[in-house]
Amino acid sequence: MGGFIVCLNGRFFYRFFAGKIRVDKGISQGFFADSYVVKQSSCYGKKLLDAIRDPKQPVTMEDLDHAVYYYLDTLDRFGILDEKQRIPGPIGDTVKMQSAEVARRLAGKGAVLLKNEDDILPVDFSGKKVAVIGPGGYKQVMPTFKESPYGFEDRKNSVYRLLREQYGENITFSIGDDLDGMVIPSDHLYPSCDSTEHGLKRYVGRFTYETLSNGDLDVVPRTETFVVDKEINFSGENALPALKREQRRGFFKETPKEYYMWHGFLCSNETGMHRISLQSRFPGVEAFEKNHVENGDLSIATSGNLYIREAVAREYLTRAGLGIRVSANGVVNPFSEVVSCADGWNNAGGMVWLEAGKKYEIYFNHTCIYLEPLEVRLAWTTPSMTEKAMKDAVEAAKQADLALCFAWHQSVNDKMELEENQDMLIERVAAANANTVVILNNGDAVAMPWRDHVKAILEMWFSGQEGALATMDVLDGSVNPAGRLPVTFPQKLSDLAARDTLHPERYALSGRISQKDAVHPNTAVFTEGLLNGYRWFDEKDIEPMYPFGYGLSYTKFSYSGLEV
């Protein structure tokens, strides 16, 4: 605005915004939306003090007082300055239930009905055989954004459990897409390429976030002191001892931390796509309090990293999974993927192509969180396991009157396609049961190659801790899905202004800043001007999959007796 980034425009904030809209408690910037403020960090500290003392500089003590007033006032209103009025924990059941009611109502109001052929929704579940298919039908799907509220664990439920409790054996569940898999057996692991011994080398080393940014094998920390683990399956009393040295040094990516590290080779007896998963348990806030952890101690950019060299001839490892992210100021992402394991563990993994009988180099690490012992396992889902899960789901769909197929998307992503084998699963379920309803849990637009083959599509987004109840409310008609799309759903990514190949200055095609990217670091270039969102589609005459503002409902209405 006026040639300035808005969050740096003092005239706008203090003279216009605060003066005319009567903001008396300060303005909160969106988390990580202040990239240009960060770039000005060199003006703080001693340089700011020197500027205040220098009469030639336009900075005064009054300006400093103005800047810190709102921050200190907020702390004071919550009793944090004198520590006399802090809200005691844990939160009581009354407050929890009040919040739960609001969360359920909002999730239901946000539901968007994208398709409802033959008015298959709402459903009278009485007497119907229903097959619930997909991990999202059994587990609450949660987002992985940096400020995602994960809610109370004891409030989370699933559509399958709710239906089963009410309608009994008529309701069945099939995973369809097996993300958990099984712990990789020792006879598929080798400490070195030419070894006949089974297992992986485990050692303790110092690791930074950038250590394997390029997957360069030469920078993997080496040590002569190691043990060979037959399987990587540590939990409960078998958990690995806590690593406490180096864990209290502040949040710096460049500061090495102590990690447990595993290195060796993986060999499958099947050819095809395998899901390799680094699974670990998040200790929870109880450990945070028990071990007297301070915000300044939360120094883990990522708790675990899983790398594999997919092709024997390839020079670099590629990252298949990223663990829990923990940083300072209480920011914790306990889940790195939107669907956790059945037992609640984080499930960081990815799909890789393996050929039977070939050995693939694998490296992964994990550090301790909140100074607790490490519970971790290395698992996989082989092609035969994937096929069995899909066949079981198809068979369940054949035996049912209605198939509820839950799908998820790892938003925000560089692609619109559903992850893993979900598109294939939906296609096969829809072919087996003409009455297939797809329920989506995602945060952005997704491709729907199966759109014409299913009866209904219900967009439930990431609906929070009460999401299962809210989804049930919409499915059985207790709530009318009155939500409308807040964004345009394109047919393909290149339809979006940000991904238009004619304008490479807008987006880093590699997904990260590099010398090959046209976009400068921390910069978004809106060369389309005001033609953003739906205006871009109108201007370019692009037919979207679903337009901005789209949404059906259960209400029936008509116009009659019209006169001009």
Model-derived regions: residue spans:
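Conserved short secondary-structure transition element at the edge of the structured enzyme core
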Residues: 18-32, 69-77
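Mobile "lid/hinge" segments at catalytic clefts and subdomain interfaces of large enzymes
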Residues: 26-44
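Short aromatic/hydrophobic-glycine micro-motifs
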Residues: 3, 27, 35, 59, ...
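C-terminal non-catalytic regions of proteins with extracellular/luminal or membrane-system context
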Residues: 1-21, 25, 43, 49-55, ...
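Long, well-ordered, tryptophan-enriched scaffold segments
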Residues: 41-45, 52-83, 91
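Flexible, acidic loop-helix segments that line cofactor/substrate-binding pockets
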Residues: 84-99
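An alpha-helix initiation/capping motif
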Residues: 65, 69, 97-104
